[in-house]
Amino acid sequence: MYDYIKGQLTKITAKYIVVEANGLGYMINVANPYSFTDSVNQLVTIYLHQVIREDAHLLFGFHTEDEKDVFLKLISVSGIGPTTALAIVAVDDNEGLVNAIDNSDIKYLMKFPKIGKKTAQQMVLDLAGKFVEAPQETGHTKARSNKAGNTQLDEAIEALLALGYKATELKKIRAFFEGTSETAEQYIKSALKLLMKG
């Protein structure tokens, strides 16, 4: 098992980042790959969780140990896999998540991709009271100069699809942001807020 990796961030895609350490490039699945844009070609520390399957060994990465802790609690719930847990972490609203779990707000929990009523109820059963203190949002969004709007929006939509959101939902998101000029990371964060509002 790995706790963290320290190395050079060499690549960002819609689904994962690549960190090079000791001559090896590690593919690491992350909640919002574009939140790492400012760190390309720089030394980074990524907190890790490894999932071993028959057909693959997967690494999931996080900005902070708090983010990793939320992820680990989520995948302990029956019906929630790593991809769904990443989609929940990507919303970056841990306080809202904890409040929803502790107050049995099933409707809020069902707004996450692939979370139906039964899984939402299971989240409440398994996790209520488990978050002693709601971790703060990671706050890793930084203001940057805007790049070409459409390309950035395309990348954001691709990343949201990778998190499990439906194309029909994202068609409305694309229409909402058409004509604006933001970074992919900013589009993702804004889109996730809109998706959670329903």
Curated annotation (Swiss-Prot):
Share the domain note from the entry: Has three domains with a flexible linker between the domains II and III and assumes an 'L' shape. Domain III is highly mobile and contacts RuvB.
For whether the record's keyword set contains DNA repair, the answer is yes
Region (Domain II), start-end ranges: 64-142
- State the Gene3D superfamilies in the record: 5' to 3' exonuclease, C-terminal subdomain (1.10.150.20), DNA helicase RuvA subunit, C-terminal domain (1.10.8.10), Nucleic acid-binding proteins (2.40.50.140)
Pfam families referenced in this protein's UniProt entry, alphabetically: HHH_5, RuvA_C, RuvA_N
Q: What is this protein called?
A: Holliday junction branch migration complex subunit RuvA
What is the annotated localization of this protein?
Answer: Cytoplasm
Q: What stretches pass through the bilayer? A: none
Q: Read off the InterPro entries from this record.
A: DNA_helicase_Holl-junc_RuvA_I, Hlx-hairpin-Hlx_DNA-bd_motif, NA-bd_OB-fold, RuvA, RuvA_2-like, RuvA_C, RuvA_C_sf
User: Any one Gene Ontology biological process term?
Assistant: DNA repair
Cite the residue spans of the region called Domain I.
Answer: 1-63
Record family assignment = Belongs to the RuvA family.
Q: For the region Flexible linker, what residue ranges are annotated?
A: 143-147
Purpose of the protein: The RuvA-RuvB-RuvC complex processes Holliday junction (HJ) DNA during genetic recombination and DNA repair, while the RuvA-RuvB complex plays an important role in the rescue of blocked DNA replication forks via replication fork reversal (RFR). RuvA specifically binds to HJ cruciform DNA, conferring on it an open structure. The RuvB hexamer acts as an ATP-dependent pump, pulling dsDNA into and through the RuvAB complex. HJ branch migration allows RuvC to scan DNA until it finds its consensus sequence, where it cleaves and resolves the cruciform DNA.
Q: Please give the organism.
A: Streptococcus pyogenes serotype M5 (strain Manfredo)
Q: What's a single GO CC term here?
A: cytoplasm
The root-end lineage is: Bacteria, Bacillati, Bacillota, Bacilli, Lactobacillales
**MF-aspect GO terms:** ATP binding; four-way junction DNA binding; four-way junction helicase activity
Keyword vocabulary terms for this entry: Cytoplasm, DNA damage, DNA recombination, DNA repair, DNA-binding
Binding partners and assembly? Homotetramer. Forms an RuvA(8)-RuvB(12)-Holliday junction (HJ) complex. HJ DNA is sandwiched between 2 RuvA tetramers; dsDNA enters through RuvA and exits via RuvB. An RuvB hexamer assembles on each DNA strand where it exits the tetramer. Each RuvB hexamer is contacted by two RuvA subunits (via domain III) on 2 adjacent RuvB subunits; this complex drives branch migration. In the full resolvosome a probable DNA-RuvA(4)-RuvB(12)-RuvC(2) complex forms which resolves the HJ.
* Span list, region Domain III: 148-198
Sorted alphabetically, which NCBIfam families does this protein's record hold? ruvA
